[in-house]
Design a protein with these regions (language model features):
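A short helix-loop-beta-strand connector motif used in the catalytic cores of GNAT acetyltransferases and
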Residues: 42-56, 73
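Conserved GNAT acetyl-CoA-binding A-motif
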Residues: 100-111
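A short beta-loop-alpha structural element at the N-terminal edge
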Residues: 2-16
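Conserved acetyl-CoA binding element of GNAT-fold acetyltransferases
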Residues: 70-82, 90, 111
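Conserved GNAT-fold acetyl-CoA-binding loop/helix
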Residues: 16-45
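Conserved beta-strand in the GNAT
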Residues: 56, 61-78
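Conserved acetyl-CoA-binding loop-helix of GNAT-fold acetyltransferases
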Residues: 85-98, 121, 125
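C-terminal "cap" of GNAT-fold acetyltransferases
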Residues: 109, 113-120, 125-175, 180-186, ...
Length: 213
């Protein structure tokens, strides 16, 4: 299984994965005003706009995780809770750095919300360096919310094709034994059923079905 470009069928599950992951990581550490504006619908809208530049790991319609790049910024990287600890984040990071290199970016950057210790550890583990604290505009419905973040940067060194391939193959072998998210689209009813059995996707699917993605 390789990292791939997102498809329209990924939209609803990706938005849900992103929203859940954001809440898990950020609710305890961001201002309440930002948390209140960060609704599931807002993540659906943002994912619909950014889907063409999303890279995904996992089956179509049942992603394990994704990353999003904007210019020289690794803007987002999230993994479904069920798939954490299996190397998914590392595979996504490898792909993100490759995409940035291919785009001619020598020193990309990313923003990590202050207090997000798990994300900070992963950044450091994968060779990113904390360079400063800065304020970034966090997107909310109808505007932006100023959020202080840790800014990480990394100088992308050229790696041999063999070393990159070997690392990816090792991680993919580990992923083969991991069971992905249990949620997905019921082919008979067209309802997107979450892992806890909630038929959330019909509402989202109806909304998203009218969009041009």
């Amino acid at each position: 299984m390789s990292v791939r470009t997102a498809e329209p069928a990924d939209l609803a599950p990706l938005a849900l994965l992103w929203w859940r992951g954001w809440r898990d990581a950020h609710l305890p550490i961001v201002p309440k005003a930002l948390a209140a504006r960060s609704t599931l619908d807002s993540f659906i809208d943002r994912m619909a706009v950014t889907l063409p530049r999303i890279r995904v790991l996992g089956p179509v319609g049942a992603p394990f995780g994704f990353h999003m790049i904007r210019g020289d910024e690794l803007q987002q990287l999230y993994v479904a809770e069920e798939s954490r600890g299996a190397g998914v984040a590392t595979l996504l990071m490898i792909d993100a750095e490759h995409c940035l290199q291919q785009a001619g970016v020598a020193t990309p950057w990313l923003g990590c919300a202050i207090g997000n210790a798990r994300a900070a550890r992963f950044c450091q583990k994968t060779g990113w360096t904390l360079v400063r604290t800065q304020t970034l505009p966090s997107e909310i419905p109808g505007g932006w919310f100023p959020l202080k973040v840790w800014r990480y940067e990394k100088t992308l060194a050229q790696r041999s094709a063999w070393s990159a391939r070997a690392e990816s193959e090792l991680l993919e072998a580990r992923l083969a034994s991991v069971r992905g998210p249990t949620e997905g689209m019921d082919r008979e009813t067209g309802v997107y059923v979450t892992a806890d059995g909630i038929p959330w996707g019909r509402r989202a699917g109806d909304r998203l079905g009218s969009r041009q993605v």
